[in-house]
Amino acid sequence: MNTARGSSSATPPANGVRGAGTKGIPRARREEQILAAAMDEFGRHGHASASMAAIAGRVGVTKPMLYTYFGSKDGLYLACLERVAPRLVTAIEEAMTYEGPAAETPHRVLSAVFGVLEEQRGAWFVLYDRTLRPGTDLHAAAQRHRRTIDDLAASGTADLLRGHGNKDPLDADALKHVWTGTVGALVGWWTSHPDQSAQDMAARCARLLTAIRG
């Protein structure tokens, strides 16, 4: 999918924490804080350029603590990836299998994606990270999730065309590429407009889809 990042204003420290100590913080809570900060850092800068020092600083812990919790920078990225990708897949699947008019499926899917990303829009760019080197375990892990989402997109666009009497596989493939690019572009636009909520985006997409359909 399209992975263009939108520019956005600086994000506050993860979960409002700055300079917090480590004592008295349950491990699960600390992991949540680290993952939130890492998701934003990886989403903004990509795995290759993300700074472990910046992540630690935002949470208020030392770099060694990040390695204690997640083993490595790669381990932390994978934890972020496995946090967002299954949620996106599940949300898309539920939107596609909802018993409603087929013509409304694109809007349901978009609304589902925005809902998952509401609190951390950068999570999309963790999944679609262009800095991951082909042939690495990280790239393979991300590709596995991307293929799942692409397969859902292929199924959905083919179903949409069949509903209009079109069974041409090349038409379906072309529409899938249009769709996946559109979703990525919309998330990128949303990222550069932080004042817009998931509900705002869902309503905007409803208007855009209505205009496109005429």
Language model feature labels by segment:
Residues 113, 127-128, 179, 209:
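Short alpha-helical scaffolding segments that buttress acidic/His motifs in well-ordered protein cores
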